[in-house]
Structures are given as C-alpha cells and as structure tokens.
Amino acid sequence: MNHTKMHTAVTNPIALGVIGLQKGDVYASDFQVTAIPEYKTEIRVQITKENFNRTTFDTYLKAAKGNEHKINYVDSLEAKPQFVILELLDRVALMAEIEEAHNTKTLRYIKSQKETGIVTSVSLAISQELIQELDNADVVFLKNSAYKQYQLSLVKEGETYKTIDFAKTSIFGYTLSYFCWRENDKRQITLADIIDEKSSCSKNTYRDAEKALENMNYFKL
C-alpha cells in the first residue's frame, strides 16, 4: 500500500470498516460516514508499524488536538516515535458480512450509490503500551463492541486477551476501497470484489450495480 496517498482525517471521525462518501477530489477533503455495517463475524486486521516523519506527525497534530498521546517528535533525532496502520485483511469475509441479512439496509444503500467507499485502512496514534500489546498478539480482528461501534480484538493462543476501543486512538489518515458488482449463477446482482481506490473492476464486474443489472438484462434478450 502507498501510505503517502492516504486521505487525512481532520474534521470528521473515521473508523475502520465504516462506509461513506468522499467529498471533493483532493486527499485532504472530507469523508462523510453514511453507513456503519454490523460485523457479527470478526474481520482479520493486518498491523503495520511505521516511524513518524515530519509530514505524518504534522497530520497527526491536526487530528489530535493538543497532542493527546504526548508523542515527542524531533527531526534531528534518529530514533522516531511510531504510529500504526490497520488494514482490513480478509476481503472475502468482509464481503460475506456485508451481504448478510443483518446488513440488508447497508447493502441496499451501497448498491444505489456507486460512489460509496469503505474505509479499509487507517493510520492511527496510540500509546506505546498499546503498540506493545498489538505486537504481542498472534492475530487482531475488527469486531462490534456495541451498536454501531467497533473495537480491536487481540488474540493469543486462540484466546482474546485484550480489546482496544477506537476512542483510545487518534486516527489521522485513511484509505478507501470501492465495491464491484456482478451477476451470480442465480442471475442476481451480488458483490464481486472490493478494490483499492485507484483500481478498476475486473472483466464483467462493475462499480455501478445498475450497470451490472443492465448487462444482465441485455444478455437476457
């Protein structure tokens, strides 16, 4: 992933896994959350640690008013503080959850809005203690903690030993992915893929669900 192409999260709260619309064409524009899927099945998350540089640190300061995590960044020092990138890793499980009955309204909405995106990675600042907890985990999942709220579930040796609420983090960047649609064997329009922002849908799949429907109807003639 090219993390320099992340959108910056300044004015609106962003969370991993939410759905919405990007306002404007520039990477500093706003993201409007329009749907919050329910993830009854946990979605695996990839964890990557990165060193702050001047650009990412300044972006963090804009998002975290008052440097709430007390991160000390000095250009001249070789040792730099770290932030974390979380990325939804299991796209198959993600699509399956969105198509479950408990997300019927969300699925109907994204079918009707071809510009709808889903936040599939975030850059966030957390305490050094929580970074160490993430390091200790065998695997990390995104899960629902309460109605329309998410948290991270940290698993070691098959057992959840800690959860982290996003309220304890400062998200300062995010990337979006988009939905591709196709006709299935039952001649229904279904999710085919979730692709990165600058990618294109594969052959016979479409960003616009209506176009997939038109294509299906054409071949019925």
Question: What do the predicted segments below correspond to?
Answer:
Residues F141-K148:
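A short, structured loop/turn motif at beta-sheet edges
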Residues M1-K80, K198-L221:
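An N-terminally focused, membrane-permeabilizing/fusogenic/translocator signature enriched
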